[in-house]
Amino acid sequence: MKYVVIVGDGMADYPVESINGKTPLMVARTPNMDWLAKHGSLGLVRTVPEGFNPGSEIANLSIFGYNPLQYYTGRGPLEAASLGVELKKDDLAFRCNLVTLHSQGSKVVMEDFAAGHISDAEAHEIIAYLEQEMGTEEIRFYSGLSYRHLLVMKNGGSVCSGLERLGLTPPHDIIGQEIAPFLPENKDSGRRILTLMTESQRFLKEHPVNLDRKAKGLRPANSIWLWGQGRSPQMVTLKERFGIDGYVISAVHLIKGIGLLAGLEVLQVPGITGYFDTNYEGKGEYALRGLEKKDFVYVHVEAPDEAGHMGDLRLKVEAIEVFDEKVVGTILKGIKDFEKVKVMLLPDHPTPLSVRTHTAEPVPFVIYSNETGEKKHTADTFDEVSALKSGLFIEKGYELIERFLIRNPGSHE
């Protein structure tokens, strides 16, 4: 049996008044996802357990089959795995965003959590500069992609125990808001984080990359923002649990990191960016190549989530339609060559246009198998309303992978 998981990041949404109370999934043209709904088993799944922040790290851990309560230690260490950064027992890894802060009178506002989606080359130059100017034996900067980077604090978990438990807000949760209420207190462990972020602003203010960006009318990367800290998690691999080998396909270090910790191999696809200009078709084509060699492929596409964060309805509908045509469509066409195959498709979490950040509501999922005789919960369309009407609901999202890999997808037990 061959298995494909396809994740459209942040596709789910709330009803939008301007499109007659429908969601982007409902108005987008998605013949391939709708085909899966008609021939598979449709339902709702809670990927974010109650009490957890609805981050992609939590939701994708659940989809991969890992209970966040047991395995989640922070977003930073998951991204460290993708970057090949080895963490020792007491090392703390922080997600390090390049952001754009803007002064409005006496207030400082989070203008852009992604620094205008700064290019990889520009970001690499900035992170290398910060490592040169701010890096020490204790503090190390590692370059990722675009605005997504890593800061590792050596022995941070033992030198200052409060750092690990410090509540740090993801910058995409506070777009357009004053940052002061979301900064850690200026004492003990919080002071160390404040000092690093403030110091970065001094170094970045007149950096050549930012001067050039401002001259072009682009948003500068004028600060770092630290969050998502934690130690390296100890995870049982999918091969140990289910006896399968496979690949993960994503431009996002977080997803690749989870895949690596789950024992998968990263399948490198040329031209993937984690943005609207990604190589959608290449992801589908490489997923099929992966299935020729191994049993399992996890395909992740970031674009719908980015549109949600921007609050742009047109872009979100377009991203969903391109995802359906070039990723889902390519995979559905190619899997006809395999004798036995199962497909699971879902968003990881909603990223509603009205709030421009992640939320924790259950999301629609569909499981399709080309084997006959499996009980199904079918519908005409793949969307939030059809999934709700199906009557199939998975409360513990991390159990969905077992339903996909082991059990009949339509059963309620």
Can you annotate each of these PLM segments?
Residues 1-413:
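Feature captures the catalytic ectodomains and active-site-proximal regions of enzymes
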